[in-house]
């Protein structure tokens, strides 16, 4: 039975992932700021975590290590999005986005390094907008650039981990019908639901490490 850690589980793709792993009776720890949407159960534990806070991340890792003997799968799904014109996007806006989308991811991985199983699969959830040469959208300068940084972080960590059994990949998602998408593009209808994308991520987490390592993989049939 695998031990899975997922961030950003209160809604959207993260929420659906918890349901899918739970249905397989995997042990799941959810790191989220909103504890109201997923109750604790026999194999699912929910930990209040602010990924912009190193102290909160450390507390979450302590909980993980108390609960799990090792971690098989880590899915860094949590994301912060601000949709503002660049000339109205403040230093604080950029900082808040990067803290969750980049710094928090790096710190969580760093603190879990001794806890990963052999092999372990880390999956960073990014955006197609963070890939060089992809279509870009006005108002997402902080979000898309942070996802670009996350993509490079994945490639750098591959270089550092490649002699180990830690596999790391990034899935750069296109349009998925979530609250985050609706906030960025009100009224836009995405071709995929959160559950459909979660099903793909689940399968990739279990088998993708056999075929990919250190890769930024576009997962998109549409990009608003």
List PLM regions with ranges.
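Conserved NAD(P)H cofactor-binding loop of Rossmann-fold oxidoreductase domains
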Residues: 77-83
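C-terminal helical subdomain
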Residues: 170, 186-224
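Residue(s) in the substrate-gating loop at a strand-loop-helix junction
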Residues: 127
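Substrate-binding pocket helix/loop in short-chain dehydrogenase/reductase
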Residues: 85-86, 93-95
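N-terminal Rossmann NAD(P)H-binding glycine-rich loop of SDR-like oxidoreductase domains
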Residues: 10, 18
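Alpha-helical segment proximal to the catalytic Tyr-Lys
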Residues: 114, 155-160
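Active-site helix of classical SDR
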Residues: 109, 143-149
């Amino acid at each position: 039975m695998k031990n899975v850690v997922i961030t950003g589980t209160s809604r959207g793709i993260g929420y659906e992932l918890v349901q899918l792993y739970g249905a397989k009776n995997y042990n799941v720890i959810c790191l989220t700021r909103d504890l109201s949407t997923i109750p604790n159960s026999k194999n699912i534990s929910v930990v209040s975590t602010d990924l912009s806070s190193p102290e909160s991340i450390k507390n979450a890792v302590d909980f993980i290590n108390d609960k799990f003997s090792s971690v098989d799968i880590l899915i860094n799904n949590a994301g912060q999005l601000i949709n503002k014109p660049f000339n109205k996007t403040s230093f604080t806006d950029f900082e808040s986005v990067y803290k969750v989308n980049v710094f928090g991811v790096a710190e969580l991985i760093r603190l879990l390094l001794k806890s990963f199983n052999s092999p372990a699969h880390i999956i960073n959830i990014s955006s197609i907008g963070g890939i060089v040469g992809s279509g870009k959208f006005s108002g997402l300068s902080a979000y898309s650039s942070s996802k670009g940084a996350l993509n490079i972080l994945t490639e750098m960590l591959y270089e550092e981990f490649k002699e180990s059994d830690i596999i790391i990949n990034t899935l750069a998602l296109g349009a998925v019908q979530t609250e985050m998408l609706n906030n960025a593009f009100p009224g836009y209808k995405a071709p995929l639901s959160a559950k459909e994308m979660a099903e793909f991520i689940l399968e990739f987490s279990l088998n993708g490490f056999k075929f990919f390592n250190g890769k930024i993989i576009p997962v998109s049939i549409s990009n608003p």
